[in-house]
């Protein structure tokens, strides 16, 4: 079995960052012993060097290999330079027991919006062209809109073109972060799993800090949402070969009040 932990948006340096949550998640990850940890960005709050160094102190306590893409907060204040020095490459590939994971930087300096860009499409197709039991793509920004996240400026600007590249490349799962709302979409045979914030109280509606765990064995994939200090639920469970979907459980991530219509108010 391959186990991949997906964490996102710790926001070290934010007044809403909770060290106790991050410490607990590190303990849980080390007990779980995943084959790899994928972090989809916003390690920092403002991209400052000291925030990066503080994140590295947490990261270095995680025993599993960890691969990271930058988020929009990490690209602030020329923070992408610190990312390259202290974290590593912004675009990368990783192989884990027949699973190929590809990460790409979708951030733009000092902008909240993001894009992947056509100059990367050829490389993405190339790295996914070799056979793999499971193909995973990771980026920070949303690939598809997520309910309860406000105006749709949170997807990458080139989402349509990128979707075409990923689907035609046979990608099975996309991992994203950004707006702190956990959710899963299915489009054709590809699943898009968004993670919440792992250690921040910048929460939308009634969501809670959480992270995802992906388990893959014998053609079967299970994605579980876990909460620090206990609890969680399976949010997707399916077979790759048949597309058969055993389970998809999504709680309403953001409580939305029903607005009375004019007639109801009369």
Positions of PLM-derived features:
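Beta-strand-turn-beta hairpins that frame and shape the catalytic cleft
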Residues: 1-5, 93-103, 129-136, 186-192
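N-terminal active-site segment of His-dependent metallophosphoesterases
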Residues: 1-54, 58
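Active-site neighborhood of phospho(di)ester-bond hydrolases with catalytic His/Asp-centered motifs
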Residues: 7-8, 36-42, 66-72, 105, ...
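Active-site environment of divalent metal-dependent phosphoester hydrolases
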Residues: 12-16, 45-50, 72-79, 109-112, ...
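Extended active-site neighborhood of metal-dependent phosphoesterases/phosphodiesterases
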Residues: 49-130, 161-167, 212-213
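Short acidic, glycine-rich surface-loop motifs adjacent to enzyme active sites
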Residues: 131-148
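Conserved beta-sheet core of the metallophosphoesterase superfamily
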Residues: 151-220
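A short C-terminal boundary segment appended to hydrolase-like catalytic domains
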Residues: 216-266
């Amino acid at each position: 079995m391959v186990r991949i932990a997906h964490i996102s948006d710790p926001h070290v340096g934010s007044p809403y960052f909770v060290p106790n949550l991050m410490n607990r998640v590190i303990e849980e990850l080390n007990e779980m012993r995943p084959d790899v940890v994928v972090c989809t960005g916003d390690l920092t709050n403002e991209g400052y060097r000291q925030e990066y160094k503080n994140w590295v102190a947490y990261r270095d306590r995680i025993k599993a290999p960890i691969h990271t893409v930058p988020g929009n907060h990490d690209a602030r204040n020329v923070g992408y330079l610190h990312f390259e020095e202290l974290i590593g490459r912004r675009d990368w590939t990783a192989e884990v027991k027949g699973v190929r994971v590809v990460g790409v930087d979708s951030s733009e300096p000092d902008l909240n919006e993001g894009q992947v860009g056509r100059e990367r499409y050829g490389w993405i197709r190339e790295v996914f062209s070799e056979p793999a039991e499971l193909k995973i793509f990771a980026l920070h920004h949303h690939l598809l809109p997520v309910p309860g996240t406000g105006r749709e400026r949170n997807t990458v600007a080139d989402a349509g073109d990128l979707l075409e590249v990923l689907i035609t490349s046979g990608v099975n799962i996309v991992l994203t972060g950004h707006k702190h709302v956990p959710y899963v979409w299915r489009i054709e045979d590809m699943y898009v799993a968004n993670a919440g914030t792992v250690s921040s109280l910048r929460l939308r509606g009634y969501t809670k800090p959480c992270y995802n765990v992906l388990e893959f064995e014998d053609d079967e994939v299970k994605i579980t949402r876990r909460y620090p200090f206990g609890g969680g639920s399976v949010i997707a469970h399916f077979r790759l070969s048949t597309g058969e979907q055993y389970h998809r459980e999504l709680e309403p991530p953001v409580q939305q009040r029903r607005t009375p219509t004019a007639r109801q108010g009369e």
